[in-house]
Amino acid sequence: VMKNQTKIRSAKLQILFAVLILTLLAAVGWNVTVARAESGAERFDQQMQPILGSYLRIGDALSSDSLTGVRKNAESIVKLAAALDSASVSGEHAAHYKNVPANLEKAARTLSKAEGLEKARESFKKLSQPMAMWVSMSKPKDVDVVYCSMSKASWVQKHGKVRNPYHGAKMLECGEIVGGDSHQGHEH
């Protein structure tokens, strides 16, 4: 009877050990999958940083009623967007990331050819769509998505006071922060 109880205990311990090992392997496998998905998105987000810089410079110029640097920065976005690799992104937002490079490249190309402040602002609306989507997904630090109900359009800007690129000095603070680090804004 003692031998049987010892064998039963030994078998139970082996089963418990096997379950524990399988659970740990499943957890490690899951974490490896998550890490791979995050590294693809992280790599994409790193590639987006110079694009974000050029985009923010365009927004600053337009909010100051200026075209200075707009064409140069738009051309830079065209080149940088062509080199983006969204194929490595997997997980929840993979389908959204997939379209960002082509949408950025097309909108930036149009903006680089825009003549005059009003046409540049209209083209900037199209460029802002994939940028706002990306910022909403990746949440880069100190960057907000702002919406202007007067323009019926969003844009991305550095965290701080709203500076409307679609109306400039006429309605510089028209907009509401709807995403990013802050959710407070000034709305008309």
Predicted regions and their residues:
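Intrinsically disordered, low-complexity terminal tails/loops enriched in metal-binding residues
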Residues: Q14, L24-H188
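Bacterial N-terminal signal peptides that target proteins for export
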Residues: N4-L22, G29-W30
